[in-house]
Design a protein with these regions (language model features):
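Metal-dependent polysaccharide deacetylase catalytic core of the NodB/CE4 family, i.e.
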Residues: 14-18, 26-28, 32, 38-118, ...
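Beta->alpha turn/N-cap motifs
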Residues: 133-134
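N-terminal pre-catalytic segment of deacetylase/amide-hydrolase enzymes
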Residues: 1-18, 156-166
Length: 166
């Protein structure tokens, strides 16, 4: 994977490189964004909650990846189950998700919640990377189990996007 190789310093990526992702694989993203991705041949990653959605990708340019199987819920402390479960429970859920999607590579933490136990569960399940909701940029040496993002919200204008990317 190019992102992993970049983080390891084994691959050069040009400045202002982006990875387009979607959380939850919501139908609105499939209806509104997937046609744009398809039209412009932009590879995108859709993080799917596989307990709720298992259909094929809406385009050959959309890669389905795990947003867990069924951990998109509040746990005992009000935060996501990802920070309430044991590493074994997390790994079991991610194994189920990987079985549906047919791939282990990267997950998106539900609600962006994670801790060391969550990281252990992700690794135990055989995933290499995990994406947070923390703002930031991926650089060489970034923690692969705590990848930051630049969040783009519905209705955000082109100017805001340009200033975010640089």
């Amino acid at each position: 994977d190019e992102l992993s190789a970049f983080i390891d310093g084994r691959l050069f990526l040009p400045d202002h490189s982006v990875i387009v992702t979607d959380d939850d694989a919501d139908q609105s993203w499939f209806d509104l964004a997937a046609p744009v991705v398809d039209k412009y041949h932009v590879l995108a990653t859709s993080f799917m909650i596989t307990a709720y959605r298992q259909d094929p990708p809406p385009s050959t340019y959309v890669l389905r990846r795990s947003h867990t199987h069924d951990m998109h819920k509040a746990g005992a402390n009000g935060k996501g189950e990802m920070v309430n479960f044991t590493a074994d429970q997390i790994a079991a859920d991610l194994e189920t998700s990987a079985g549906v999607l047919g791939v282990k590579e990267v997950i998106a933490y539900p609600f962006g919640h994670y801790n060391d136990t969550a990281k252990q569960g992700v690794t135990q399940a055989g995933f290499e990377m995990a994406r947070t909701v923390e703002p930031g940029y991926v650089t060489i040496g970034t923690d692969k189990l705590a990848l930051p993002v630049q969040r783009i919200n519905y209705g955000m204008g082109l100017g805001a996007l340009e200033s975010m990317i640089g």
